[in-house]
Structure formats: structure tokens, C-alpha cells
Amino acid sequence: GIITLVDAINAENTYNNHKEAIKQTALADKIILSKTDLSESSNINSIKNRIKKINPKANIIESNKKNLPLTELIGLNDYDPLNNSWDSRKWLAIEKYNETTNKNTHHNHNHEHEHHDINRHGDNIESFSLVTNQQISMTTLNFFIELLSSQMGSKLLRLKGILNIKGKDGPAIIHGVQHIFHPVEWLKEWPDEDKSTRMVFITRDVKKSIIEDFFKIIGKN
């Protein structure tokens, strides 16, 4: 897992002037927000909101010179699909990519649809989820991953997905960070009754519409 340290005093200035800091936040599994004892609560809340827009799933841990909760740094690796006790829904955390947006009407239909873009704050980072109820062929999946890797490269900061593949009883699990993708893993069975394909994305300097166009390939095959 990845830990990123964010200075509560200088965070806004750092984010505004250093794109690399935004990237590091987007890739993090946990954020240590330091010097919270030296910052106003309103400033801390503002920073936390900005962090959540950049990376909805990352846990934010407040710390100060008197308190660094070391126990929070244990168990950072939440990607372990071969472990029988691994919770794929908690790992995907798709609800966190939707909770800070305006509620959109949800329609029960059988084609791909968008599940909210929660980033509109000028950091050039977009975090969103996409869902389709159609099954996907392995050929389509491999092509989709290759397309994302070759066309997006380092601009695809993170991708996680639970996918319904034709001819398979359990879902496929995909996980990519920039142009590097883990091998596709398979679960023996679905964790619940929802067998839709669900993916969450964090991108930089890439319009969501481009990913949506790639995603439509899945719905057509």
C-alpha cells in the first residue's frame, strides 16, 4: 500500500503549485494529514474535502506532534483477491466515488451508464465509476486493458474493476496503476447478487468522456 504525507499548513499551496503532490495523493491508499494541531479546523476540513475529491477511497488520518496513530499504518495492502476472506466490495468502494456528488436518478436498464464525476475543482484529476450490466468477453477485456495502457499511460492514475466475463461463474478482478496492470485474478463466486461490471477510475489530464468512449467498447461486445 501507498502512504502519502500531507502537511495541513501548506497543503493548499502545495496542491496549487505542484502537480506531483496531486498525483501522489491520487495514488495513495492512506493519507497522513500532519500538523493538524497547528491549523484551524476550517482549514483542515477544506483540505480533507479536497483530498476526497482527488482520491475518494483513501483513508485520511489526522496526526500532530503528540499523536501519530501507528496502528493505522498496519494492513495497507487491501488488494488480495486470492485470500478467501478478501472483500472485493470494500476494495472497490464504488460508493465513495459517488457519495460526494449530487444525487442523479438511477435507471434500471441494460446498457452502460455513468456513475458520477466527483472532481470539478481544477486539479485536473477526475474520479468516477462506470457500470454495465452486459457480460464481457475475454477478448474485449484484454483489448480494453491494452487500449487504456497504451493510450492513457501515466495519466491513468488508478483503475479498479469487478467484471462479469462470459462463460465464467465468478468475476474477474482488474487493478492497474498508470501503465502497469496486475494480472487478471478470478473469484470463485460473486460476493452478492449484483453481477454487474463495475470499474472505478482516477485520471489526470484526461477527460472523462474519453474513458467513457473506451468503456462503450465493452457494451458493444
Question: For the regions a protein language model found, what residue spans apply to each?
Answer:
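Conserved Switch II/interswitch segment of TRAFAC-class P-loop GTPases
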Residues: G1-N16, T36-S42
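Flexible active-site lid/hinge loop adjacent to a nucleotide/diphosphate
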Residues: A8-L27, I31
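C-terminal accessory "lid"/substrate-recognition subdomains
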Residues: K23, L27-K30, T36-E193, T197, ...
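Structural motif
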Residues: I3-L5, I32, I202
